[in-house]
Amino acid sequence: VSGGIEFNWPQHHRPSTFSPIEYTIEENEDGSKTCWVSEIDRMYGTKGMAGFTVYKDKAYIEVRGQLYNRTEVPQTFLWWANPAVEVNDYTKSIFPPDVHAVFDHGKRDVSRFPIATGVYYKMDYSEGVDISRYKNLQVPTSYMAYHSDYNFVGGYDFSVEAGILHIADHHISPGKKQWTWGNGDFGQAWDRNLTDEDGPYIELMTGVYTDNQPDFTW
């Protein structure tokens, strides 16, 4: 079940991830095609849509989100786009060059980045450990960029000399996050449980209106 893009809305780890949704496909004037998916949240009655556009001769997918409050009162929400990215011992997470510190959820812990020099997630990195490398993260770990004036987060696989960029306008979407089950026994067990063939993965997320989780907006 791991893989694809999880849209965390209206709260983190969308409760309806595996529920049926409505969809429609549009053919655009420039030859691109857009698949819109849509659902109504059963708890608060708000509506969320995501449009996936593919272009001829382009290697990226463009995703647009649209949210609607169908009720008469303000409703809280968050929105994080959460793609699964395949990883191995040669994978490095790429945060912008102005990211020098990362936070845990709720900013309850902080670490230097990319070279951690203290205790983070109860792991002793005092000797200096590059936590941008998947192979160095032995326990389930989240980290979110403290601040960045750039519009991307990504990953690079040195074994195949290729990578991925997740691009989002930092004025609207300042959130930049990585999460992993970790490269230890616990994480590897989860990788085996979640997929038959695709192996371990990390999550490289971007979030709107906030740089941390589980912050909500209106």
What residue ranges belong to the model's regions?
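A contiguous, surface-exposed recognition patch within enzymatic or periplasmic domains that forms
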Residues: 1, 59, 70-78, 82-216
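Extended, loop-rich substrate-binding clefts of extracytoplasmic carbohydrate-active enzymes
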Residues: 3-60, 188-208, 212-214
